[in-house]
């Protein structure tokens, strides 16, 4: 796969349900050329720049950090993006205690290893209709701090401030779940 991706005059089509294979294929380019097409709800979603809200820096980041575990997001019916190991371990346990089996519902908890969740969330953000039906939740603490001068703000104001710092409003299928404290 790596060798074929280096060839400019070669086109190949491969269908898979394997995050192992998906992690080896470049997500797309910062052009309309596509390497990955994601199928969901009777629609096909190209990953090229003309279709997603991925930016050039996102493609570069994801080509480096989209490994086998994280590539599972392409096959999930729902995705929970978390910052670290603690959340990756605790969220399925908490869900289970609430009577929800994330695996049975095909919901993937993806540990992005930092506050780099927006690189991954933009995979689900489209430039035009139809909107992707994969629900994506971002669970984060206040590492990305709102612009305040130690003033107490309402929760909605904090979320707006964080979304502003992220550089865009989030579409309906991507939800920011912001902790009230500086750490979870």
Model segments located where?
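H-loop/switch region of ABC-family ATPase nucleotide-binding domains
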Residues: 15-17
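Acidic, divalent-metal-binding catalytic cores of TOPRIM
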Residues: 2, 7-9, 22-24, 28-184
């Amino acid at each position: 796969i790596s060798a074929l991706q280096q060839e400019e005059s070669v086109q190949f089509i491969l269908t898979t349900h394997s995050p192992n294979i998906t992690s080896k294929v470049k997500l797309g380019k910062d052009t309309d050329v596509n390497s990955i097409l994601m199928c969901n709800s009777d629609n096909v979603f190209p990953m090229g720049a003309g279709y997603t809200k991925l930016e050039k820096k996102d493609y570069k980041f994801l080509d480096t950090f989209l490994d086998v575990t994280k590539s599972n997001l392409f096959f999930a019916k729902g995705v929970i993006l978390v910052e670290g190991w603690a959340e990756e371990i605790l969220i399925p346990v908490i869900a289970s205690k609430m009577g929800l089996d994330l695996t049975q519902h095909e919901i993937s908890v993806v540990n992005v290893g930092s506050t780099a969740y927006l690189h991954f969330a933009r995979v689900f953000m489209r430039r035009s209709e139809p909107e992707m039906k994969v629900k994506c939740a971002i669970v984060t603490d206040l590492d990305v701090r709102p612009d305040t001068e130690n003033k107490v703000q309402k929760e909605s104001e904090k979320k707006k401030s964080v979304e502003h710092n992220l550089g865009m409003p989030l579409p309906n299928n991507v939800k920011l779940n912001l902790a009230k404290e500086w750490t979870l």
